[in-house]
Amino acid sequence: MTGSIPLVAVLGWIAYDFANTIFSLNVVSRYFGPWILDRGASDLALGAVIAASGLVVALVSPLLGVVSDQLGRRKPLLIVCTLACVAATLGLGMVGSVWSALLLFALANVAYQAGLIVYDALLPVVSRTENRGRISGFGVGAGYLGAVIGLYLVQPFAGEGDERQGAFIPTALLFLLFALPAFLFIRERGERQGRVAWGAARGVIRQLRETIDHAGHYPNLRRFILSRFLYADAMNTIIVVMAIYAERAVGMSDTGIDSLLALSIVFAVVGGFGGGFFVERWGARRVLGVVLVGWLITLGLAMVMTSVTMFYAIGPMIGILLGATWTSDRVVLTRLAPAEHIGEFFGLYGLAGKLAGVVGPLVWAATVEISRFAGLGHSAYRVAVGVLIIAILLGYCGLRPVPDDKAVVISSA
């Protein structure tokens, strides 16, 4: 037992993080993009579908939070979202039409992202205030572990080219299998509400507008949110297109790509823990600035590198930088936002990340298509990396005037 909370409920919640990363890595990051491009879809079509599904999630996530609060039960919504994602992923394993596959991918991605919102909101159900951070950390660790194990469990079912479709059905089944403990053992407390007060949902939209206006009174915070949009735009895109770039621009084999992704995941753990240490020692804003410079160097190397052997070094570098970025940038927000508005501005922080996930894939895809039209062939992907470098550079320039968090004074307009 964890206090009055059954240990099986805690383990069930942690297991769900293990489960959902099997989907996100195998479908979103690893197999769907290369497979659908081999089937004849354009980069622009793929980017548009990723952007559209991200936009749907950005629009519905505040409403989903309100609905779950109003109903008083989140687990039923988690089950519905998970089953919808599993069903769409199973469909990907059987579908023949490119456009049907794109639609199923969009549905799976929306259901997956919506499920994450509900899943995160279940953390207070399986934890107490004093152990919440520890249990959340176990979930993150289980997620990294699930990504690596899921990658290699599915690998025997996925061939090359069109045979990559074989990855989707086992991925769906593994997601469902490891999600079952959460479905079975998490018990929500409190009274069930009978209906949703949609006036509260409209209030969320009104509050979002007020939050954006409110952020204007804090110039440093506003600068940081805009900078985050720019660098998150690049990083969210990298997560989605890394396998495509490794295959098409560098010439890596499927086995090599699996190793590259596994290395990046392992080193993301190192980056997360190491980033936390340096944040405490040097300050979050300073660490984030150094990390963004690291991104510029790493992507610059990736843009010009042609050796498959040398490209293996890019995976660990990206992993470390991803872990350190997400560790440091959320701390920057806590230093810049007034304590009484921290939740409000974390919502804006999250929205910036979601919108970056919409814009980034579109910009990437449009750059690839335009460059290919200009006759650059697979070098078009290198040009697209150059655009990501520009986005991170702009984000870095926007961050520089923000004072270090050890001496932050929040100024009002």
Go through each PLM region and give its residues.
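Hydrophobic core of transmembrane alpha-helices in multi-pass small-molecule transporters
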Residues: 88, 98-115, 310-324
